[in-house]
Amino acid sequence: MEEFKGYLQKGGFKQQHFLYPLLFQEYIYALAHDQGLNVNASTFNEPPEISGYGNKYSSLLVKRLITRIYQQNSFIYSVNNSKQNRFVGHNKNFYYKMISEGFAIVVEIPFSLRLVSSLKEKKEITKSQNLRSIHSLFPFLEDKFSHLNYVSDILIPYPVHLEILVQILQCWIQDLPTLHLLRLIFHDYHNGSNSIPPNKSSFGFSKDNPRLYRFLYNSYVVECESIFDFLRKSSSYLRSTSFGPLLERTHFYGKMKHIGVTCCNDFQKTLWLFKDPFMHYVRYQGKCIMASKGTHLLMKKWKSYFVNLWQCHFHFWSQPSRIHINQFPHFSFYLLGYLSSVPINPSSAKSQMLENSFLIDSFTPKFETMISIIPMIGSLAKAKFCNLSGNPISKPAWADLSDSDIIDRFGRIYRNLSHYYSGSSKKQSLYRIKYILRLSCARTLARKHKSTVRAFLQRLGSEFFEEFFMEQEKVLSLILPRTSYPLHQLSREPIWYLDIIRINDLVNHFDL
C-alpha cells in the first residue's frame, strides 16, 4: 500500500484522481503478476521494434494494445486477415487478459487507500483484530439467532448487466477514460454477453482474471448492502451493538457513509413498513441470511423489498423463489462448512412446594453447529483419501515420499480439520474423519513397502500415529490450565479459535 502511495504521488495522479495514466506504468503489470519486469513482449506477437523494447511490459506495448481495443474496425480487418495477423482467436482474449490484469490493480487503488485511511481514523476497528477470524462470526450467531423467530435464506441473484456495474463504479471512480475502457473490455471480451457472471461461452472471464471478477462482484454486493443498511438504520429505533464491528468482518470497510442522497428520497415513504429493532444480516459466499424477531408478515415485506430492489435498481428479473422464509426450529443452513440450526432443546426441572412436588418442562432454543459428514466424505473422496462410500484408500501420489513425510501430511490434514471443526456441537463426525485419514495413511505406507496394513501396523505398533494424529483433548490439555473444566466435558462444547482466516481447502470443495 505504501508503494501505491509513492507511485501516485510521484506521478501526480492522486491529486487529479486520474487512474487511466497508471495503465501505462510498467510496475502495475509487475504487481499484477507478482514478478519482475521480465516478460518477453514477443510472446504477444509484436513487431521487433516493440518486442525488443527491454523485453518487458513496456508502456509502448500497453499503449498499442489499448489502441487496438479502441479501433473496432481493426477487429473486422483482423478476422479477414487472420493468417497475417494473429490478433484473432485466443490471442485476442490474451490481449484483453493482459490489459484487464493491470486494470484490476488500478481500480483497486482508490479503494485500498480509502480503506487504509478509514482504519487509521477508526480506533475501534483496530481493537477488533479478532474479527478477521472466520470463527468470530459463530459467537455472534450463538448470541443473536437463538432469540429470533424467522429467517430468510436469500440466494444473491445474478447475472448483473455490465452497464449497471459501470454505473456503480462511477460513484467511486471519477475518471471517464478508465470507465470507458472498462466498457470496451466488457463488451469485446464477452463477445456480446452483457452480464456478469457471464454465460458459458464467456465464463472464462472469472477464471482468467479472478481478481477483477471478485472486485466487480464485490462492488455489486456492496451496492446492494449499502441500500439495505441505509434502510435498516433508518427504520430501526434500537441499534444493535454488534452490527458495527460485524461490518468490518463482512468487508464493508466503512463504505456505508457514502450512500447517495437519492436513496433517502426513494425509500422515505416505505420506511414505516419495516419497523424492526432485531434485524440481523449475514452474508457468506453467494448467499445471505436475514433473521428477525418479527412476524411472518414482516419477513414477507422484506422479501418484496428485495425483489423490487433487484428489479428496479439493478434492472433484472429476480425470481421470488430465491428467497425462502422459515422458522428457526425448522430451518438449517450450510455456513462456512458447518451445518447450522437452532433446535429447541427440552429440559425438565423438579420443583417442590411444601408436600407437593411437580416437574416443570421448559423448551430452550440453542444455536448448534455440526459437521455434515456426507459432503465431507465426498470432499475426501475427491481428494483421493477414500471412495464415495467412505472406505479409506491409499494415496499413490504420495508413495514416493519418505515415511515421516507421508505421516506428517496426513497428520497435518487431520489437525487442520480438527482445528477448523472445533466448534462442532457433536464430534462423532470428526472421529469418522480421523478414522478415514489414519487408515488411508496406513494403506499408503503399506503400498510403499509392498506389505499389508495388518503386517505394517504389527511391525510398528498403533502408537506410531499418535503423535501425528493428536486428538483435540490432548491439545487442549497442553493449552488450558489444569483448573479448567474436565476435558471430557470441554470436548463436547464448541470451541472457536481466532486465528482462522480462510476456509479449509477440503471444506471449500463442497461449501458452495
From Swiss-Prot:
It comes from the Eukaryota. GO terms for molecular function: RNA binding. It is found in: Plastid, Chloroplast. Keywords: Chloroplast, mRNA processing, Plastid, RNA-binding, tRNA processing. The gene is matK. HAMAP family: MatK (MF_01390). Its main location: plastid. GO terms for biological process: mRNA processing; RNA splicing; tRNA processing. GO terms for cellular component: chloroplast. It comes from Lemna minor. Belongs to the intron maturase 2 family. MatK subfamily. Pfam families: Intron_maturas2, MatK_N. Transmembrane segments: none annotated. This is Maturase K.
